UniProtKB/Swiss-Prot annotation:
Induction: By nickel.
Cellular localization per UniProt: Secreted; Bacterial flagellum
Function: Flagellin is the subunit protein which polymerizes to form the filaments of bacterial flagella.
GO CC terms: bacterial-type flagellum; extracellular region
Protein name in UniProt: Flagellin
Amino acid sequence: MRINTNINSM
């Protein structure tokens, strides 16, 4: 898991 400013469903 990365910390990004994106909308992802984890």
